């Protein structure tokens, strides 16, 4: 009897998620980072993780996505990815590890990475585009995590199942998107100014360009 498609996906997808992340960590290591380069990533990862734990009682409402986006904006795509990935790993040490951890590490990592990319294009000078990115990132995060549920627990995997999963999660996805928008509105300006001063003063991360 041949292997079922869902069984194959359960093996292949985690490997792919790991392979997606490895180049980011290798690229950072190849830069030969100094301790001062590690501090912003470590501190923001911990802040994001603790913020997620503090708001754990409110499903999908947390500041972690906003923190990750700010990290990417201020320190570049690579630092944004690492902050997102490590904050997911750290927060799940408090909230519980599982097969979803790799998915969250990848989703938050890419959220921070693209924030860094878009910041460099200058589009985030328009605040409405920044807040729109934050809101949509929360929605897309939820849809991405739906794939983990579908691949892990649903068979056969059909388009109907995908649509049903997205409909069922819409309340949580909206909560995530709205909370990200709110925390960006509250935190991005004051934190951005302070982080920019630190970046310029100590010449860390994005100053040396990625």
Language-model segments: residues:
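Aromatic-anchored segments of alpha-helical transmembrane domains
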Residues: 1-3, 45-53, 88-94, 135-144
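Generic transmembrane alpha-helix motif of multi-pass integral membrane proteins
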Residues: 23-26, 64-80, 114-118
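Alpha-helical transmembrane segments and their helix-entry boundary regions
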Residues: 68, 80-84, 100-101, 130
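Hydrophobic transmembrane alpha-helices
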Residues: 1-69
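Membrane-helix interface segments
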Residues: 34-37, 77-82, 123-128
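Interfacial aromatic-anchored transmembrane helix boundaries in multi-pass membrane proteins
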Residues: 49-64, 85-119
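Alpha-helical transmembrane segments in multi-pass membrane proteins
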Residues: 40-48, 72, 80-83, 87, ...
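Membrane-embedded alpha-helical hairpins and interfacial helices in multi-pass inner-membrane proteins
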Residues: 1-15, 101-102, 117-210
């Amino acid at each position: 009897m041949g292997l079922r498609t869902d069984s194959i996906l359960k093996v292949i997808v985690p490997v792919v998620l790991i392979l997606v992340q490895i180049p980011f960590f290798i690229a950072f290591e190849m830069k030969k980072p100094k301790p001062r380069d590690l501090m912003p990533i470590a501190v923001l990862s911990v802040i994001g993780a603790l913020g997620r734990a503090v708001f754990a009682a409110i499903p999908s409402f947390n500041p972690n996505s906003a923190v990750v986006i700010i990290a990417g904006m201020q320190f570049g795509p690579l630092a944004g990815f690492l902050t997102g990935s490590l904050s997911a790993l750290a927060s799940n040490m408090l909230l519980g590890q599982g097969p979803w951890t790799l998915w969250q590490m990848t989703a938050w990592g890419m959220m921070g990475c693209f924030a860094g990319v878009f910041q460099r294009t200058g589009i985030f000078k328009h605040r409405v585009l920044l807040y729109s990115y934050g809101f949509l990132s929360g929605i897309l995060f939820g849809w991405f995590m739906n794939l983990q549920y579908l691949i892990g627990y649903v068979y056969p995997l059909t388009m109907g199942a995908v649509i049903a999963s997205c409909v069922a999660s819409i309340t949580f996805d909206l909560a995530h998107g709205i909370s990200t928008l709110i925390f960006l509105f509250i935190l991005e300006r004051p934190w951005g100014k302070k982080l920019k001063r630190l970046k310029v003063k100590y010449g860390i991360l994005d100053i040396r360009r990625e």
